[in-house]
Amino acid sequence: DTSNVTDMEGLFYKMKDFNEDISAWNTSKVENMSSMFEDADSFNQSLNNWDVSKVKTMKNMFRGAISFNQPLNKWNVSEVMDMEEMFEAAYKFNQNINSWNVSKVKNMSYMFNSAKEFNQPLDKWNVSSVEDMTCMFRYTKKFNQPLNSWNVSKVKYTQEMFYEAVSFNQNLDRWNVSNV
């Protein structure tokens, strides 16, 4: 019974063979999912019906989850403030998460770093609270989606944001980078 659990940090960290169905878990009180599936090499199960509405940090959540490629479009991430390295080195992840309300997120550094397959639209994201986009799309070899609608006026850090993102060829002329 997970109905009273508030912290799931590192729950399946480095559990290389874990690939069980946990889709029915009650996660409605969880506030911390950081590193939950980090380096869970085999995990590729549905989580789309999870209630993540109270989660504040998803830092490293799927970092190195090299097999994971499941829809997450139903997630309510409106309370999340930290998505640093969330999909870093999640090599197969390529799902549409454009519907996410990321308006409270401050840190998106390394979020898709080395997510080699990721190439989904993110133009509907409200990134107006984000301050750190360091290496956000670094080594995303396939990513080439429009981001010109983003309000990046609070962003301070963009080092290597598109480093080795060899497919990226989008106009960013509407970006206000005066705080960088």
Question: What name fits each language-model region?
Answer:
Residues 1-180:
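Negatively charged
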